[in-house]
Amino acid sequence: MTDLTEKNTALEEEKIESAVENQQKSIWKEIFAQGIWKNNPAVVQLLGLCPLLAVSSTATNALGLSLATMLVLTCTNTVISLFRQYIPKEIRIPIYVMIIATTVTAVQLLMNAYTYTLYQSLGIFIPLIVTNCIIIGRAEAFASKNSLLHSIWDGFSMGLGMALSLTILGALREIIGQGTIFEGIENLFGEQAKFLTHHIYHTDSSFLLFILPPGAFIGLGLLLAIKNRIDNVKK
């Protein structure tokens, strides 16, 4: 009888452990899905439109700024989650901005040192990451309320979702506007990445509509339409 009770207890414990493990896995998956698709910063929340529209004239510029933004998001989420219990609620926003500004400054110095040509190309939009609503929004909505590991994963997922949207938009505008893709990628990853540059078609003059800001609005509209169409089909 005692053996049977012990076996039943062990089985119950295994079931509980399995349920907890499955719940943890579903949390990680949901955070990732929110960042990449369900709550994508660019095509769902429509945040960070200033760099999205201004810098996405080429895939290389878009990828460079999006990687910088992803790094800042991940780092700020990490720091804010780590010290969330010590940050006074009354002055939390100024503290978040200081943390974000410090991280952006570090990223800016790194880009100035290692990717100088891209740094010059992006110009004012690197320091403007400080004012990006995505970063302060994730700090307030997620990092200040959740565990360290979940906050790191949320920052990475949201940053990756932003990076994918920005790079796709940049690639679309570059292909239609100039007939190339990843032109100047060596400025970001070095000469070994030059094989990624491709000339899709030859043109004597650029298609200015897609290179200039109106092309960014058209491209973003196409991305929004495609995403909404996919969501409607899934329903």
Curated annotation (Swiss-Prot):
First-tier enzyme category under EC: translocase
UniProt-listed InterPro entries = NqrDE/RnfAE, RnfE
Segments crossing the lipid bilayer: 63-83, 93-113, 117-137, 152-172, 206-226
Subcellular localization, per the record? Cell inner membrane
Q: How does it sit in the membrane?
A: Multi-pass membrane protein
Q: Which domain of life is it from?
A: Bacteria
Enzyme Commission identifier(s) = 7.-.-.-
Q: How does it assemble?
A: The complex is composed of six subunits: RnfA, RnfB, RnfC, RnfD, RnfE and RnfG.
- Recorded protein name is Ion-translocating oxidoreductase complex subunit E
- Record organism: Haemophilus influenzae (strain PittEE)
